[in-house]
Amino acid sequence: MHKVRVINQDTGEPIIGAIIKGPKGVQAVTDEEGYFTVNNNDDQVLSISYVGFKPQNIKAQSLQNQSTISLIPGADLQEVLVTASISSARSQKALGSKVDHIDLSNLSKESHTNSLSDILDGKVGGVQMYQSNGKVGMPIRFNMRSGATMSMERDPIIYVDGVKFNNTHVSDINSSQDALSALNDLTIDDIASIDVIKGPSAAASYGAEAANGVIIITTKRGKTNNPENKKADILVKMTLGASTLARKYDQFVNNDALNNFFQTGWQKSLYTSVSKAFQANQSLFFSYNLNDIAGIVPGNKDQRHSAKLAYDLRSNRFTLGATASYIHGNISLPQTAMGRYDAIWNMMINQTPWPYIEESAWRAQSWIYNNDRFIGNLRLSYILPGDVKLESLFGVDVNHTEGIYRLPYGYLLGNNSEGAKSISNRRNSNLNWDIKASRKFHLADKLDLTATLLSQIVQQKEDMNSIAASHFRSDVDNIAAATERTVTESTFEQRTWGLYGEAFLNYDNRLFINAGLRRDASNLIGSNVASIYYPSMSVSYNLRNQKFRLAYGESGRLPYPTDARTSYVMDGVSAYGPIVHPQYKGNPNIKPERMREIEFGSDWTIKNNHTLSLTLYAQYTTDAIIYEDLLSSDGWIGSMPNNVGKVRGCGLELNYNGTLWRQGDRHSLDVYANLNYQTNKVTNTGGRDITNYPNVIKEGYPVYAFYYHTVDGPSFNRDGSYNTKVGAIESSDYAYLGKPFPAVNGAFGFNLKLFKNFTLGTKWNYALGASIYNQSFYNVSGLGDNLKKRNDQLQALANATVGTPEYNQIADELAKSARFRANYIEKADFLRLSTLYLGYDLSTLARKWTQNVVNGMRFSFAIQNVFVITNYPGADPQVESNGGTRRQRGIGSLSRDITNAPHPRTYTATLSFTL
C-alpha cells in the first residue's frame, strides 16, 4: 500500500475530497491533507477527479515511485459542470441542448452590479431581460426564446442552491407597474455561477412549469483547499455610487417640471465574506451584505441587509451540505405611474404641472414595504454498497412582507382630505423535497450507463390580508379611527409531485445520449386529469474541435388557480341556509399548456482561442388555455377555460467568444458577441379573437400582437378647416401594427487587459423589430396640452391658409398625432451602451504596503446605461407597464408605456481586497 497526495497544479495546495474511481466505482476520497491510499500491485486504471479540475487517468502501478498527482484547474472549459437536468450536472460536451453557464466567482472582486438582469442580459443567447421601469426594486421582464405562449406567466423557474425560489412580485399597496420584485432579495455578490436553461428541450425534467426555462443559481461555498488548514480567505468589497436621469425629456412644451423632478440617487454597498476549511473535510462560508440605494425618483430608496452561512462536510462515502440565508429589507416605492394622481402623469399632461394633485400632497404620501426572508437547504448524499448514490435535498424559502401606505390628514387626494392608510401582510413560502438515487454501470469497453430516479415534492403557499382605511377624524391614523374600512383576504396553495427517470449513455467520452421522462401531478390541474408526462431526449457527439447536439423535450405551464374547480360566493343567508351565486365555472378536464421544443446546434473551438456556437430551435405549443364566455341564461357569469389554443415559434442563436490578442499574462483582448432571431405565430384560438386592445391574440399573427384600426386621414369641417375635436378618421377595418417582442436582439463587447493590471470593458445591447404602445403620449395628445409635436403642428396650422396644400399637409400630420391608438404604437429599436468598465489591480502594491497582510486589492469604476440610440420617442425603449409578468386569468397586455419612470444612468466606484 502506498499513500499519494492530490494537489492543485497551480498553487500546490492539497485537494480535499477528490474522488478516486476504479473499474468497480469509487475506491477512495482524499482526506483533509489531500492523501489517499492505493495498492501498487493492482493493475487497474484510476480516475482522479474534482469539480473545477480536469480529471486525470493513471495506472495504479505507476504510482509506486510517485507521491503526488497534480490536477489542472479549469484547463478545459468543457469540463466545467453545468446543469444537465434536475437530477444531474455534467460537462458541456455531454449536453445535447444549449445551456449557458456564467461564472461569477470573481464578480465580487472585479465589479459591482445590483441586478440579475445586468449580469445575464446580453451574455446569454435567446434571453432578453430588463427592469420594467427605472426605479429601484422593480420587477424584471423576461423574453425567453420565441415566447410562443398565450400566458402572461413568462418568468422562468428560479432555483437557488436547489431551493425553488418564490419570485412572485408584490403590489399589495400600489400598482402592478410599481411592484416590489422578489429578485431584489438576491445577494448578487454571493452568487458563484448561473446556469440558464432556455426551453423545454433542456428543461423537461423540471416538469409542468418549465416551458419558460429555468435559471439555476449556485452560491459560494467554503474553500476546500487550504495549506495546513489554518488560514481563512477574507474578502471585503466597498462600493459608492450615484444615479442620474439618463435622457432628459424634450418631447413636451414644458419639460422643466419633469427634468427637475428627478434627483441624484446615492448608493453605498458593503460586502464581506469569510471562507475557511477545517480538518475532517469540513468547510465554512459566511457573508454579510449591506445595500443602501436611492433611486432617481424622490422617496425611492432601498435598504437591505443579508447574511449567509454555508457548511459542508465530506467524509468518504458521505457528504452533507447546509445553507442558511436571511434577508431583511425596507424599501420605499412611491407611485409615479398608471394613475390620475401619480407624479409623472401630473407633470406630463399639461404645460402647467400637477393639475390633479398638489405636488406637496404627492410627496406627503408614502408606500413602504418591509420584508424578511429566509432561504435554507439541507443536502445529504451517501454512496451505498454497489455504488448506488442516494441524495436528498430539503429546501425552504419563506418570505413575510408588510406593506404600509399613508396619506396624511390634511392633504387633498381626489375628494378626500382626511387621510388614508392601507396595511397589507403577505406570507409566501416554497418548500421542496428532492430524493434521488443513481448508479453508474459499465456495460462494455468505453460504454457506460448512468441511471437516475428522482422524486420531487413542491408546495407553494401565498397568504395575503389587507385593510384599507380612510377619512380619519383628526391627524391620527389608527385604523380603528377611520370612518371607512375595507378588508381583503386571499390565499393560494399549489402542490406538485414529480417523478423523473433518466438514462445517460456515454460512449468513449465522445457520444452521449440522454433519455428522460417526468410525471407530474398537481392540485391545479382538473380532477379528471390524473397526471401529465413530459419526455426528453438528447444526443451529443464530439469531434476534436467540434460538437454536434440534438435535443427534444416537452414542458408546460400550469393553469390559473381557479381554472380547475367551480367556485361560489356567499351572498347572504335565508331561512333555508346560505345564499350563494356562481363565481367561476371550472373545467375538471383542464390540463397544463404543453410546449414541445426541438433544438439542433453545433459548437466549434478554433485554434483554442475562439469558440462559436450556433443553435436552431422550433417550439410548438398546444393546449393553450382559452376562456370561452358563458351564457348568463345558463346561470353563469364570466368564462370557462378550455385547452384549445396553439402557437408556433422558432429561432436562431449565434454566439462568439474569442481572444483576439494575447501577450503572455500582460496584455490581452477578449471579445464576445451574440445574435438572436425569434418569431412566433398563433395558429389556433378556437375560432375567436382574444382582445385587450391594442393587444390581441389572433390566428395568423404573433402573440399579443398590436392590432387595431388605422388612421385614414384628417377630419375636416364643412368649410375645409381641420376638425381639432375629432382629429382624424379611423378605418373601419383592423390592421397589424407591430409586436411586443424584437425579431432580432443581442449584445457584443470586449475586455481589454493592459500591462497585467489595467482592464477596460464594455457591453452593448441592441434590439430590432419590437414595438411599444406609447400610452403616455396617446393620453397627453388628447387629454392634455403639453405634447410638443402636436402643439407645434397646431401653431403651424394657425399660420396656414385653409384649403392650401400646406394646410392640408399640416392637417395630415395632425391626424397622425391625434389621440388614436394606431398613432402611438411606435417602433422601439435601439442600440445601448449598457456598461463601460475600468479596473486596476493593486495587489502587488497592497502586498508591499501591508507586508502581505493584504494579498489582493482591486479598484474599479463602472457606468451603466451610458447612452442609448433609439427611434422610440418615449422615456426608454425597454419598459413594461404591467411590471413584467404575473399570474393572470386570460389575456393581459405587453409592451405598454404608461408614464413609466425612465432608466437612470448609474456610476459606481468599487474597492475590494482580500486577506
Model-derived regions: residue spans:
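Extracytoplasmic gating/loop element in the C-terminal half of outer-membrane beta-barrel translocons
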Residues: 767-858, 863
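Surface-exposed loop/turn segments flanking beta-strands in extracellular/periplasmic regions
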Residues: 249-257, 338-360, 404-421, 461-489, ...
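Flexible loop and strand-edge segments within Gram-negative outer membrane beta-barrel domains
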Residues: 240, 267-289, 293-300, 304-374, ...
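Extracytoplasmic beta-strand/coil segments of soluble accessory domains associated
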Residues: 118-166, 193, 203-223
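N-terminal periplasmic "start-of-domain" segments of outer-membrane beta-barrel proteins
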Residues: 21-35, 83-110, 137-141, 169-176, ...
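Conserved small-residue
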Residues: 237, 241-255, 642-648, 662-740, ...
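Short, acidic, small-residue-rich periplasmic hinge/interaction motif at the N-terminus
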Residues: 5-23, 49-53, 63-108, 223-224
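Short acidic/polar hinge/loop motifs at secondary-structure boundaries
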Residues: 37-39, 163-198
